[in-house]
Amino acid sequence: MTHSTLRIRQARHTDAAALEQLASLDSSHAPAGDVLIAEVGDELWAALSLDDGHAVADPLRPSADAVLMLGAHGRQLRREERRRAHGRPRLRFA
């Protein structure tokens, strides 16, 4: 039995056709804007738009956990972006 690793990464423009195909499998439209994808090996299992939260997943694969992981990773990325934008919080002493 082989074990494959789920990998999360930012979508690239070269992923457009695969995102459209995944959305078609999920009877939906492809996520737009900043998109994270979850892939196992060379197969795209799920994708999530960081802009509006729209997700698609391969219904023929056990992809529910992949969608949850994309959401958690996306929230972490957004928190880090907000921290960088606002600088480090300062400690205040009473």
Predicted regions and their residues:
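Short amphipathic alpha-helix that is part of the acyltransferase structural core
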Residues: 1-29, 84
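Charged, low-complexity, helix-prone segments enriched in Lys/Glu/Asp/Gln
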Residues: 26-31, 39, 73-79
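Amphipathic alpha-helical "stalk" segments
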Residues: 2, 40, 90-93
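Soluble, non-transmembrane catalytic domains of enzymes that act on hydrophobic metabolites at membranes
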Residues: 14-17, 43-46, 51-52
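Conserved beta-hairpin
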Residues: 34-46
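N-terminal low-complexity, charged segments
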Residues: 24-35, 55-62
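Acyl-donor binding region in acyl/amide transferases
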Residues: 50-94
